[in-house]
């Protein structure tokens, strides 16, 4: 049996029936990590995870399970999520050497249930990027074809699951940073409703949109981990309860489900391979009895402008804390305070991060804040969110491709931010309206690259979305892509 090709639920079954040791499972993932270092998915694989595995094996041997429903389940973690006594760098030179003094709430909940955190994964610096190339540790490559990008910003978390270096991983999703790399690497990528998972311990990028998300090969695994990590948290005032009676996930026919298709996301705008795959996806759903209705939401035409107005403003505010005075790397030169700030941030932040900070500060400057930032917030709250709320009164889910484009070649669009930002046009919708969304692997092109399809659900109806996605995978025969 290949121990590195297991779902979490299968690991649970093998461990509880004592057919396999947790240590042997973790060792299999460690060996896969050693064989696939060129992908650059991990920043660090935790060697002490093997010691924890031995300890849990002893607990199982002595029948000392306590309340550990996730015992022995290996999970990789994006490097912007805090794990006590582990490095937290957000893949930035400016934070190298920083050790987190506390656990994020999601991490604490996983540890308390018996999960084993096996490593920190690579990412675009401070979660800013859509290719996985903007990291001080180097680019993460696509396991399906190493000449192409994995997508970002949670590229490392996607890569380690896609290459079976981990069965499950945590990422963060601000505008599609979980779903895009999931689509590019042929796995599942899930973003919960805004507030569904506590953001305490997640390094902030754009606080209005940030959300921890999951990568997996299994819908059941996503639902299991969501069940044990979701819920309100006193450390995060935006957190909400989302658990409902759709868990365990329901097996239902697709017959009669009402799906919406947004007219403005025209197939004419898509890469031809994406367009043909999306057309087939729609046909497959219709053949199973689902109803698909085309709706017009004109505000989609400037949804990227809204996102790339609000998110840089929040980023410029959130990243102001990285001064070099309290934590992270520090210049030792004798400089004035202003010169210290200037040199420190100029030397230790990447071009993409500086680009977004400068844009955010510009949009907040006198005379422009009301013209751009305030206007964007007004349009979002008064037009976009109400329109989607109205749409969900008559439909169950929205379907789109995960991205209009296929993966870029490594380095090809490094200096073309507009093209890179355009890859987010479908995914930012869920972040702006606070809804749950998932990317399903649907097809592959002649280069072996994956094309994913996105399903967006109602806010706080995450398990309903996961149940529907499970049934789409089952009825369309998408397992094993």
UniProtKB/Swiss-Prot annotation:
Heterotrimer of A, B and C subunits. The active site is at 78 (charge relay system), 153 (charge relay system), 177 (acyl-ester intermediate). GO terms for biological process: translation. This is Glutamyl-tRNA(Gln) amidotransferase subunit A. Pfam families: Amidase. It catalyses: L-glutamyl-tRNA(Gln) + L-glutamine + ATP + H2O = L-glutaminyl-tRNA(Gln) + L-glutamate + ADP + phosphate + H(+). Disulfide bonds: none annotated. Keywords: ATP-binding, Ligase, Nucleotide-binding, Protein biosynthesis. GO terms for cellular component: glutamyl-tRNA(Gln) amidotransferase complex. Its EC number is 6.3.5.7. It comes from Borrelia garinii subsp. bavariensis (strain ATCC BAA-2496 / DSM 23469 / PBi) (Borreliella bavariensis). Allows the formation of correctly charged Gln-tRNA(Gln) through the transamidation of misacylated Glu-tRNA(Gln) in organisms which lack glutaminyl-tRNA synthetase. The reaction takes place in the presence of glutamine and ATP through an activated gamma-phospho-Glu-tRNA(Gln). The keyword ATP-binding applies.
């Amino acid at each position: 049996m290949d121990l590195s090709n297991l779902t979490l639920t299968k690991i649970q079954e093998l461990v509880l029936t004592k057919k396999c040791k947790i240590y042997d499972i973790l060792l299999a993932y460690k060996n896969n990590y050693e064989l696939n270092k060129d992908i650059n998915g991990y920043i660090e694989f935790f060697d002490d995870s093997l010691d924890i595995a031995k300890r849990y094996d002893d607990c199982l041997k002595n029948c000392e399970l306590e309340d550990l429903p996730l015992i022995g389940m290996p999970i990789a973690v994006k490097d912007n999520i805090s794990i006590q006594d582990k490095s937290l760098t957000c893949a930035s030179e400016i934070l190298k050497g920083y050790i987190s003094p506390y656990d994020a709430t999601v991490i604490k909940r996983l540890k308390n249930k018996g999960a084993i955190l096996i490593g920190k994964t690579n990412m675009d610096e401070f979660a800013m990027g859509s290719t996985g190339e903007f990291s001080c540790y180097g680019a993460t490559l696509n396991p399906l074809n190493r000449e192409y990008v994995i997508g970002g910003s949670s590229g490392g978390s996607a890569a380690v699951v896609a290459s079976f270096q981990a069965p499950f991983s945590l990422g963060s999703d601000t505008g599609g940073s979980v779903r895009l790399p999931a689509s590019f690497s042929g796995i599942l990528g899930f973003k919960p409703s805004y507030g569904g998972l506590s953001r305490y311990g997640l390094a902030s990028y754009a606080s209005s949109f940030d959300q921890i998300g999951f990568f997996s090969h299994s819908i059941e695994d996503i639902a299991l981990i969501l069940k044990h990590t979701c819920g309100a948290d006193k450390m995060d005032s935006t957190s909400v309860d989302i658990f409902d009676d759709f868990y365990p996930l329901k097996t239902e026919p697709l017959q009669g489900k009402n799906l919406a298709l947004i007219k403005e996301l025209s197939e004419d705008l898509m890469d031809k391979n994406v367009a043909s795959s999306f057309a087939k996806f729609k046909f497959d759903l219709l053949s199973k009895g689902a109803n698909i209705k085309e709706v017009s939401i004109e505000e989609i035409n400037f949804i990227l402008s809204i996102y790339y107005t609000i998110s840089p403003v929040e980023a410029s505010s959130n990243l102001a804390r990285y001064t070099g005075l309290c934590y992270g790397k520090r210049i030792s030169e004798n400089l004035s305070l202003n010169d210290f700030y200037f040199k420190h941030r100029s030397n230790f932040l990447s071009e993409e991060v500086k680009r977004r900070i400068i844009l955010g500060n510009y949009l907040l400057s006198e005379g422009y804040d009301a013209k751009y930032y305030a206007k964007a917030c007004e349009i979002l709250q008064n037009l976009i969110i109400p329109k989607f709320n109205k749409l969900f009164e008559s439909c169950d889910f929205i379907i789109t491709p995960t991205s209009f484009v296929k993966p870029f070649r490594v380095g090809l669009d490094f200096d073309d931010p507009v093209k890179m930002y355009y890859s987010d046009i479908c995914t930012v919708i869920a972040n702006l309206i606070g809804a749950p969304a998932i990317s399903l692997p649907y097809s592959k092109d002649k280069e072996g690259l994956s094309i994913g399809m996105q399903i967006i659900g109602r806010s706080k109806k995450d398990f309903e979305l996961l149940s529907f996605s499970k049934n789409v995978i089952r009825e369309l025969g998408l397992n094993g892509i």
